[in-house]
């Protein structure tokens, strides 16, 4: 039993590091292209694809090491563990990028989001623009953005873990 727990922990850390590493590589690519502050659905879909791939690979690797068996509980532990490790790595890099590599990142993101809001709603009044700016700045602060990234990451990681766990699970015969 302890051998199974050791394999579970090792799988979580290995695939969590892979998830975090690929996420950091993607973030570096965006930084080099000066797109790191723009967000967008393509970046979100790419991040989700990286998450799904890392979680699924971890679950399949554990199943292989566990004599071909994986129950839903183990799949959920692996998925959420991989998600937590990967998000921590990505957030640490994100802080490094925002503090060291691009200290103006929050201002760039705020201006970009505000210009997008004005483009989509040209009838915005000055008061509406000021309120929008306040909300964007509040949401872009390091503490709030970290909390949202971690929270949403766990929610999506849980959903992905459940779905992929149901797909790849294989119960032991009774």
Role assignments for model-derived ranges:
Residues 1-6, 168-174:
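Short, charged juxtamembrane terminal tails flanking transmembrane helices
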Residues 133-155:
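Individual transmembrane alpha-helix segments
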Residues 22-26, 30, 50-55, 86-90, ...:
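Alpha-helical transmembrane segments of multipass membrane proteins
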Residues 114-140:
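Short membrane-interface loop/juxtamembrane segments of multi-pass integral membrane proteins
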Residues 16-21, 79-88:
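Selective transmembrane-helix segments that form parts of the transport pathway or gating/packing helices
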Residues 59-75:
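Membrane-helix interface/capping segments
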Residues 93-121:
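Functional transmembrane-helix hotspots
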Residues 1-61:
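Transmembrane alpha-helical insertion/packing segments
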């Amino acid at each position: 039993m302890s051998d199974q727990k050791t394999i579970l922990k090792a799988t979580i850390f290995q695939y969590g590091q892979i998830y975090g590493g690929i996420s950091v590589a993607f973030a570096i690519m965006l930084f080099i292209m000066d797109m790191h502050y723009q967000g967008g659905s393509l970046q979100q879909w790419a991040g989700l694809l990286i998450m799904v791939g890392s979680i699924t690979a971890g679950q399949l690797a554990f199943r292989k090491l566990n004599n071909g068996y994986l129950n839903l509980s183990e799949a959920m532990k692996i998925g959420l563990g991989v998600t937590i490790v990967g998000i921590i790595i990505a957030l640490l890099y994100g802080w490094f990028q925002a503090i060291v590599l691009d200290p103006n990142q929050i201002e760039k993101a705020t201006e970009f989001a505000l210009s997008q809001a004005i483009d989509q709603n040209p009838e915005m009044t000055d008061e509406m623009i000021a309120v929008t700016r306040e909300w964007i700045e509040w949401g872009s602060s390091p503490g709030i953005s970290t909390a949202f990234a971690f929270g949403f990451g766990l929610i999506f990681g849980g959903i992905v873990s459940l779905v992929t766990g149901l797909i790849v699970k294989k119960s032991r015969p009774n």
